[in-house]
């Protein structure tokens, strides 16, 4: 079943894949990594002015990673804000997605956390570096194929 936003994107020739609706009735769309930045700008102009959250997860060991964006359209005089969930999947040796920091500034720490935990690179992010783990940490702790070290060294504990 195609939602309102999906129909609008089709009408304007923007390539995506409708993933239906979640349990709350929020429309979910899949966007290709190479199209994500331009579609993000279009969604912002269309009225999705609030990035509620960005997260990422590992779909399968050694394979597909997903970056998930929950966008909200907030306007004066509207009782129920319109929401959409966008999923961008990456796979292979080049795990990169265009950063949407320049569209929604609130993506800053959220994209950095996804990078730190799963190793997804966000192109054109101004400060893409580890945020939770030390810079010297090797690997991506939330990947399903991550092998935890035998020991942990407490560093810079204050």
Curated annotation (Swiss-Prot):
* UniProt enzyme class: translocase
* InterPro entries reported in the protein's UniProt record: NADH_DH_suC, NADH_quin_OxRdtase_su_C/D-like, NADH_UbQ_OxRdtase_30kDa_su, NADH_UbQ_OxRdtase_CS
Q: Which biological process, per GO, is one annotated for this protein?
A: photosynthesis, light reaction
Q: Record keywords: DNA-binding included?
A: no
**Localization:** Plastid, Chloroplast thylakoid membrane
Membrane topology note: Peripheral membrane protein
| Alphabetically ordered keywords of this record | Chloroplast, Membrane, NAD, NADP, Plastid, Plastoquinone, Quinone, Thylakoid, Translocase, Transport
Q: Which GO terms describe its cellular component?
A: chloroplast thylakoid membrane
Q: Which reaction does it catalyse?
A: a plastoquinone + NADH + (n+1) H(+)(in) = a plastoquinol + NAD(+) + n H(+)(out); a plastoquinone + NADPH + (n+1) H(+)(in) = a plastoquinol + NADP(+) + n H(+)(out)
Q: Which GO terms describe its molecular function?
A: NADH dehydrogenase (ubiquinone) activity; quinone binding
Top-rank taxon of the source lineage equals Eukaryota
The UniProt record lists the EC number as 7.1.1.-
Entry similarity comment: Belongs to the complex I 30 kDa subunit family.
| Function summary | NDH shuttles electrons from NAD(P)H:plastoquinone, via FMN and iron-sulfur (Fe-S) centers, to quinones in the photosynthetic chain and possibly in a chloroplast respiratory chain. The immediate electron acceptor for the enzyme in this species is believed to be plastoquinone. Couples the redox reaction to proton translocation, and thus conserves the redox energy in a proton gradient.
- Subunit structure, per the record? NDH is composed of at least 16 different subunits, 5 of which are encoded in the nucleus.
Listed name of the protein: NAD(P)H-quinone oxidoreductase subunit J, chloroplastic
Q: What is the source species?
A: Lupinus luteus
State the organism's lineage. Eukaryota, Viridiplantae, Streptophyta, Embryophyta, Tracheophyta
């Amino acid at each position: 079943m195609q939602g309102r936003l999906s129909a609008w994107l089709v009408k304007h020739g923007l390539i995506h894949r409708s993933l239906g609706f979640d349990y709350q009735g929020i429309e979910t769309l899949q966007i290709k990594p190479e199209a994500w930045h331009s579609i993000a700008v279009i969604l912002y102009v269309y009225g999705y002015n609030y990035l509620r959250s960005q997260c990422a997860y590992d779909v399968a060991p050694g394979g597909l990673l997903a970056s998930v964006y929950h966008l909200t359209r907030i306007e004066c005089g509207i009782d129920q804000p319109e929401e959409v969930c966008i999923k961008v999947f990456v796979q292979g040796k080049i795990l990169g997605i265009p950063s949407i920091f320049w569209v929604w500034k609130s993506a800053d720490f959220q994209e950095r956390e996804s990078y730190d935990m799963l190793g997804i690179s966000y192109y054109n992010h101004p400060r893409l570096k580890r945020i939770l783990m030390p810079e010297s940490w090797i690997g991506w702790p939330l990947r399903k194929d991550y092998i935890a070290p035998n020991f942990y060294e407490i560093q810079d504990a204050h």
